[in-house]
Amino acid sequence: MLDIIILVVIGGAFGAMTREFIMLMVPPLTDGFPLDILVANVVACFLLGTVTALYARKIHSRDVHTIIGTGMMGGVSTFSSFAYGSVVLASASVSAFLIAAAYVTVSVVAGYVAVLAGMKFGEKSADILHRYPPMASIIDSGLVTVESRHSVAETIERVAAKAKSMGMNVFTRVDHGAGAKEAGLGLPPTELIIFGNPQNGTVLMQDKRTIGLDLPIRALAWEDGSGKVWLTVNDPAWLAQRHSLGLSSDVAIKAMVTGTGTVTKYAAGD
């Protein structure tokens, strides 16, 4: 809890400083119309829309959400000054009341338009950021490999047993070693198993159909040249980034990360 409070305070401080900087850049008006607060609120709405759209395309860590989403955005979009300014302005005189009414109307309309504009900007930015992922990240990341205490065949059996005990489906197994033998080639023991939960997988495909290319989850048990056995799986969190899944997939991805980790740990361990 303390770490969350610290992150919110840090983000809020940056947000408040940003808001004050914006207000200082706007010249005051002689008729009492709080243009500085209006501009700060419109900019805050634009930033909120942008951050919302960017978060919808990629799953970030809790700390990123806390410091930017809750902290900084909360600091920059402090609408209490908007409400206070409206009341003070309206209570001054009849003419000031009309100015306050116009101020409230313009603030709401401009804020709504700014949010929409920010979301459009965020979506375009997300398209640019995620359209061409670096080839190195595709090749070098996304795989989780752990050493197994068991043979390749037993490791695969343990994957199947644990997956079934957790309510998952085991769809198929592929014995690459046997396939190599049939082809007259040599290959150390290597077996693949495909398993998963259709409830989670369907949610992900409803978000982005292309993730069906990487579903269900695959686990590969293989023996290296020294006789050690390894178990390799795709990291579901990496798959979420690869396919630019949105926040609607967050719960399913977290469940998949937990489930895959549990299966892997059991299959490779004692």
Curated annotation (Swiss-Prot):
Topology term for the membrane: Multi-pass membrane protein
Notes on activation and inhibition: Na(+) is not transported, but it plays an essential structural role and its presence is essential for fluoride channel function.
BP-aspect Gene Ontology terms: cellular detoxification of fluoride
Localization, UniProt: Cell inner membrane
Reactions this protein catalyses: fluoride(in) = fluoride(out)
Function: Fluoride-specific ion channel. Important for reducing fluoride concentration in the cell, thus reducing its toxicity.
UniProt-recorded name of the protein: Fluoride-specific ion channel FluC 2
Species of provenance: Brucella melitensis biotype 1 (strain ATCC 23456 / CCUG 17765 / NCTC 10094 / 16M)
